[in-house]
Amino acid sequence: MSPLLRRLLLVALLQLARTQAPVSQFDGPSHQKKVVPWIDVYARATCQPREVVVPLSMELMGNVVKQLVPSCVTVQRCGGCCPDDGLECVPTGQHQVRMQILMIQYPSSQLGEMSLEEHSQCECRPKKKESAVKPDRVAIPHHRPQPRSVPGWDSTPGASSPADIIHPTPAPGSSARLAPSAVNALTPGPAAAAADAAASSIAKGGA
């Protein structure tokens, strides 16, 4: 190949490389990145079945094996935004899909099947409010211990206990005075006086 032809080919390749080189967003003020239209953004974000990755360890619910291949799968589950914070995206239609999973339990391995739930229809519905009100505490009445041997104790509900009986405090100066019943109880009667006289005469005669 002649040197002139080689130069022409090199110039052509350089021009082709320049035209195919990616243009940076900072190369010119007129360059604009592609903007996703609002209608597409809204459509992608709405509540609908979408492909999500689910770890198989969560689906086994306690059935443990050494290793699962793959360790996670993709299924259609409900997800997306709702127009109100009080709503949530929930499934209204679901079905079961069976998948083959390689279960490795050394030194052997085998193909098994797992049944996974997929969502086919979704809808925004009101969130289930958890009961934030605590149950009322049961009022336990306070019972005073009942004495085992108290004369006249009534075990029926509502009866006054000995601790409930209020003993009035005597007024000042009343402690020296005795009630008439108390004075009568301390003064000897006629029969007691005659008995004392007889006992006195017997004692004198014996002396």
From Swiss-Prot:
The coiled-coil segments of this chain are none
Which keywords belong to this entry? Angiogenesis, Developmental protein, Differentiation, Disulfide bond, Glycoprotein, Growth factor, Heparin-binding, Mitogen, Secreted, Signal
Please give the superkingdom of this protein's source: Eukaryota
- Pfam families recorded: PDGF
The set of disulfide-linked cysteines is: C47-C89, C78-C122, C82-C124
Regions of biased composition (Basic and acidic residues) lie at 129-139
Signal peptide residue numbers: 1-21
Location(s), subcellular: Secreted
Q: Name one GO molecular function term.
A: heparin binding
Name a GO CC annotation attached to this entry.
membrane
Q: Sorted alphabetically, which InterPro entries does this protein's record hold?
A: Cystine-knot_cytokine, PD_growth_factor_CS, PDGF/VEGF_dom, PDGF/VEGF_growth_factor
Known tissue expression:
Abundantly expressed in heart, brain, kidney and skeletal muscle.
Per the record, the major location class is secreted
Give the start-end ranges of region Disordered: 129-178
Functional note = Growth factor for endothelial cells. VEGF-B167 binds heparin and neuropilin-1 whereas the binding to neuropilin-1 of VEGF-B186 is regulated by proteolysis. VEGF-B seems to be required for normal heart function in adult but is not required for proper development of the cardiovascular system either during development or for angiogenesis in adults.
User: What PANTHER family does the record tag this protein with?
Assistant: VASCULAR ENDOTHELIAL GROWTH FACTOR, VASCULAR ENDOTHELIAL GROWTH FACTOR B
Give the protein family.
Belongs to the PDGF/VEGF growth factor family.
- Name of protein: Vascular endothelial growth factor B
Gene name of the encoded protein: Vegfb
